[in-house]
């Protein structure tokens, strides 16, 4: 397998197989596994070259600067700049900000290699991948005044002294399910619950085989002084996954629209176009088929066929994924930011839902700003009832 890195100007790439990977700025990289590309960059920034080290049942990845020798079961990953990595397919991880990853998934095990970009140029992320028999634990850490404490199967705690973001992905694949958790400054959580905070623009796609498919698509943007928290609730049932995102925007942001085209055994992701919006709320619609989950959460999106899903997620996002299988959906979240001004929903299901959308629009016209939160709460409950779900909101 070959990789083609995208580097900055005045960069000289030297790749040597079965040798040593070295990087500039007084840093030496030594990798004792199979392949070792080399990167030299004229400027202070460092571009990472991925090395894919497939073994019999897992694929290891070594992307680095300032990496130390690691055993075969441990991987250290540092991704500071733009990078594109491709490892043949079943699960696709795409980070539209700076990095695009395509990672292969084999049977029960899920190998997930996320990449991070930080607000400052010379901030490095170090990821340690500890694959075990049925799970992969990933613990990245920044190098700027940060203390990272990791407890396997328990809690990931991060303390950052500066206004930098740290993402801690955790992949806990079960027999038929793979869950991904990215966290920043998370608190103690039970083993059956995970919290996902994505402070940068990120798109995740976790594709499952057989009947159950868990798909998490996130596209977020950092707001200057007023970060917005958005809640995504994934409620896996016996043969379906309910994804309920609720979005808020404080300022005119550029949105990424991701179109997921699920086929029988693969998920194709096509991030495209941008939309400028001000204070827009998106209400998703879950369109369940026999073996397929279709989601239509939207603002200003066009009608799509039944096999196409369009998801727009604009802001700081928090994802809670219960690990225990739930047969009964728990409904839509009802927490909406009070500063929302506009609710624009384009739903492609039946006339009933279209009528609900019209009702929501009338609600927003009648009530003033102070009552918008109440309107949205009621609107989502109406959507729940029209879609056949029971709302868990108050």
UniProtKB/Swiss-Prot annotation:
Location in or out of the cell: Membrane
Record-given protein name: Putative uncharacterized membrane protein YMR173W-A
Lineage: Eukaryota, Fungi, Dikarya, Ascomycota, Saccharomycotina
Coiled-coil region list: none
Highest taxon above the source species: Eukaryota
Signal sequence range: none
Organism: Saccharomyces cerevisiae (strain ATCC 204508 / S288c)
A GO term from the CC aspect: membrane
Topological relation to the membrane, as annotated: Multi-pass membrane protein
Keywords: Membrane, Transmembrane, Transmembrane helix
Note: Partially overlaps DDR48.
